[in-house]
Structures are given as structure tokens and as C-alpha cells.
């Protein structure tokens, strides 16, 4: 007579299923956390690169610009010069033959719906022909700006002697990540100073 082998009991099957499901859940949690950490790192790195590009562009525009603003009412007053502002304005192009000039303004604005806040850095370019406005372009330069300050040091004239840009940016798309991990998104702060090229040539 053949002896029957004893199979798993219902309790043993339930225990095995519980162990298996626990291992699968732990694996999925680890994969999910790894994906969120990867997303967090790439978003922060991307924002850092973009912020540096914007900073380099701002410094280049200041270096080649002319007739900067805002400027203090009294250049010799220590409480007015240097001047700190949330916007910067200057002439980026001028043609004496056609009387054409382009005025660029970089300013901080409250973020609109759909933009990462609290602020967005905008660049506005206005074209004048014989002092008549002929064209205007307005576009965002950088989102996720938490603060931006332009510190302008003037000489008698007033001529801009030195401009310091202090830019603080929050890495993009980190809110969703922070809900699932304990990662906190560090802000990116870039500070740099530049002198207009015309001033350097004069010196």
C-alpha cells in the first residue's frame, strides 16, 4: 500500500503567503524610494545647471550694457549708494545712425498660475526708434526663484561701477518627492559681481 505524503496545511499556506507578500511589499517600497531619490537628485542638478546659465547670462548683459538703472538720487549719499533693488535696467544696444536702441529690464515677479514660485525672473526688451517704442518682448527667464537682489554701486555720473547679483533658487519639482521621502530640497544660492566693460576700458 502506497503511503500518502502530507501536504501543506491551510495555516502553513497562509503563513507562506504572508511572508511572500511582505517581501514583495518591502521590495516595491525600496524601488519606489530609489526612484524618488533619483528624481530628487536629477531635478536639483538640472535646476543648478539652469541657474548657473542664467547667472552667466545676466553677468554678460551687465558687462556689455550701458546707462544702468535704477540709480540713486544722490550718488554721494552713503545710505543710497550702493543701491539694492529687485530689478535691473540698462541699454543693451544703440545705433546712432538709425537712432535705434534696445532697453532691457530684468525683474522679479510673483509667480503666475502654473509657474513654480514664489517668484519668477523675467526679462523684458523694448526697442525704440527715435525715442518711439516699436516693439516689446516679455518672457520668463527662471522659475522657482525665492529671492533675487541686484546691488548696484555707482560712481559720479551716475556711472555703474559694480553690480552684484544675489540669486536664490528652489530646485524644481521637489514637492512630490518630499511627500514620499525624507529628503529636503536645499536651495541654490549664487552670488557674483561684475563691472561694465566700458568702465574697465576707461580704467
Language-model segments: residues:
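Aliphatic-rich helix starts adjacent to a transmembrane/signal segment
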Residues: 4-63
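Generic macromolecular interface patches on structured domains
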Residues: 37, 68-69, 175
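Short, well-structured beta-strand/strand-turn elements
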Residues: 63-75
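Type IV pilin-like appendage domain
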Residues: 74-157, 184-189
